[in-house]
Amino acid sequence: MWLSTFLALLIFVECVIVVYIPAYIESKLSKIKKNRFFNMENFENIASGAILALAFLHMLPEVIILSNKKNMNLYYIFILVLVSVTFLNITDILYDHHFESTFDVNCTLACENSNNQIKNINDKEITTNYIDIKSNEVIDLELKAMDTNINNNNNNNNNNKTDPCKTNIFFEIFKSNSFFIVLSLFIHSFIEGLLMGSLKDKNAIIIVGLSMLAHKWAECLIVYKNVVNKIENPLLASIYAWSFILSLPLGVFIAIFSFPSNEFVEIIFSSIACGFFLYLSFNMTKEIKITKSNKHFISFSYFLGVGGMSTLMILFNSFESNNII
C-alpha cells in the first residue's frame, strides 16, 4: 500500500510540473534569443513523437492482449480507434470554423477606413506647394483625434460585443475537442491507477509505477497543448487540468480500498485513448512552421521523441515479462 501511494505521489508531482511549467518556460524563451534546438516547437515535436510511440508500443499491444484474454475480435478494437480519430477530426474542424467565424470584421473595416483617411490627409499634405507650421499642427491634431476615436470605438465594441463562449462556461465546454480529450485521458489514467493499486507484488508495482512515470509526461504535454494553452476560460482550464492530474492517484486509492480494475472497461477506453494519441501525435505538429534553417531540427526532434519513448517502453515491457527490476 505504501509503495503504490509513494509512486502515485511521484506521478502527481510529475503531472503538476509538466502541465504548468511549459507556460513559464515558453515565456522565458520568448524573452531571449531563439535557439534553433532549445525552443518550444522542438519540445512539442519531441512530445508528438513520444505520443506516437506510446500509442503503438504501449496502448495498442496492451489492448490486443486484453482482447485476446476476453476472446474479443480485433476488428472491434480497430473500429474504436478509427471512430475516436474521426471524432477528434470533426470536433477540431468545428473548433477551427468557430474560431474563424468569430473574427471581428467590423474592427478590421474600421482600421481600413482609418488608414484610408490618414492616407488622404497625407496626400493633401504632399500636394500642398508650401509648408505651413500651423497646417502641420492641425494635421497632427486630426491624426491624434482619429486615433482616439478608433481606440474608443474598439473599446466600446469589446465591451458591448462579448463572446458568448467566454461568458457561458457550458458552451465553452463543448466549443472545442478539449473536453473529449481530457475525458479520455482522465478515464485512461484512472484505469491505470486502478491497475497499479490492485497489484500486490512489490516488483510488479515498481515496474508498472516507473513505466507510468516514464510516459506520463507525454500525456501531460497533451493537456498543456490542448487545455492550458488553448482554453480561454481560466476556471475551466484549471478544472480540466486538475481532473487529469488527480485521475491516477484517485484510481490508486480507490483500488487499494475497494474497487479493482475492470478489463472490459480498460479495453474500451484504452482503445479510444490510443486513437486520440495517434491523432494528437500529428495534430500537435500542424502549427509548426518548417523553414530551411529548422527543418533538420524538426525532423531530429520528432524522431528523438519516437526513439526515446520506444526505448523506454521496450525496456519496461521486458522488465514486466521477466518480472525483474
Swiss-Prot record:
Membrane topology of this protein: Multi-pass membrane protein
Transmembrane segments: 5-25, 46-66, 74-94, 179-199, 239-259, 264-284, 296-316
Primary residence: membrane
GO CC, alphabetical: membrane
Residues bearing carbohydrate: N106, N160
Superkingdom of source: Eukaryota
Cell location: Cytoplasmic vesicle membrane
Deletion phenotype: Targeted gene disruption results in increased growth rates of blood stage parasites.
Induction (UniProt): Expression is modulated by the levels of iron ions in the environment.
Keyword Glycoprotein tagged: yes
GO molecular function, one term: zinc ion transmembrane transporter activity
Keywords associated with the record: Cytoplasmic vesicle, Glycoprotein, Ion transport, Iron, Iron transport, Membrane, Transmembrane, Transmembrane helix, Transport
GO biological process: zinc ion transmembrane transport
Cited function: Putative transporter for the divalent zinc and iron cations.
Name of the protein in its database record: Putative metal ion transporter ZIPCO
